[in-house]
Amino acid sequence: MARVLVVCAEPIGPQVAGPAIRARELARVLADSHEVTIAAPAPSVTGDVRIALVEAGFEDYDALSAALAGADVVVAQSLPPRLLSKLPALGTRLIADLYNPTVFEVLEAGRDKATAARRRQQRTVTLASIAQLAAASHVICASEQQRDLWLGMMAAEGLVGIEDYSRDPTLRSVIDVVPFGLPSEPPVATSPAPIRAMFPSIAADDRIVLWGGGVWNWLDPETAIDAIGLIEQGRTSGPRTHLVMMGMGRPASEELDAMRAGQRMLGHLTRSGLEGEVVHVNRGWVDYDERGGWLLEADLGVSTHHDHLESRLAFRTRMLDYIWAALPIVATTGDTLSALIERDGLGLTVAPGDAAGLAQAISALLDDPARLASAKLSLERLAPKMTWQQSAASLSAICSNEIATGSPDRAALRRATLAQYPPLLAETHATHGLRGAAARALRNLRRTLTPGS
């Protein structure tokens, strides 16, 4: 039994999104075989009596440092540079969870920023990813496409060890796939049904298409809105088809809130005249344990994105929820999960930006009960194969040291860590002025010079 620390950069509580969901669910699986602690910013709860909690964010250097020192293994999607560089000396093994293709996500997330700020952010995120790869004994990601991305970065940075390759030419022992999983228990319907309780203008026999998550720069809600508008425009009788946006007020999301995607979507919706008629937006965020009621009340799940690299490499949490609830899916082509929809008959896919095609696909499913039932049956068969227990089975063995893993590259870690400071200080200077940048530099210098820090 290993002492495993799971680090999350976001609070873990009733309202969570992808990164916090993954941290909590991986911790739950690992707690079956290990002594597990979660470190996350306050306020957080583990929701599991087997899991200890350290309320510490990345700015809580001393508390997080002590938690790292007390662990045999740390599983983290990211760590601050100073703490990452301490791991080899502590003897704590890092499993870097790179399920999020940050090196491309940052290009979309910062699309509305000035070019200089985007370059600084891109440089920082890229160096942070290199540092994670250099520090890790093992790397996990969510798909084979992501694995190819990180293997390419490792090769370019000289992080493919000859000894590791000689022992395992597949390098699965160094970097492998741990997909985002599903709960083992199916969702439970709630009473009253939450969607119609919030939006009472939706009639009992109307059809609901659910947008099951937030609105970010890399997504394309406008095409979904336009598709619903086309369906309404062509309706002569019978039930209406409504688009329901499940949430916009994502917790712990200062960076995401700064994106203009939500503003653009609301502006587009206002111009369309569809809000309150056939498009409905929850400005809040649905609790993680209550989302099942929303999923079960819907007739279809939709996920649309733009055609870019982030979309090709992403592993959409909302799509996993649709599979969990056996909710037939209409989605944009181009990523891992859209290929799964096509292969297993889970719904239909359309080209990016094709509102007319999306409208046709939605109607093709909703107007054909047999086709809809077939998709639901395929989803019901697939869901038990994608649980967290199955997706993370290898992770427990890695934490137990039952599988030989790679070795951290201390020299590469040192280079990547030091290289992060200039863009980080430049970003601090841009946002907090010279005094803020100087204070950050002094803190880092003090920690460097303090023994054991």
Regions found by a protein language model. Give the residues of each.
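Short hydrophobic beta-strand element within catalytic cores of glycosyltransferases
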Residues: 300-303, 321-331
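Conserved donor-binding/catalytic core segment of Leloir-type glycosyltransferases
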Residues: 5-8, 140, 182-186, 194-219, ...
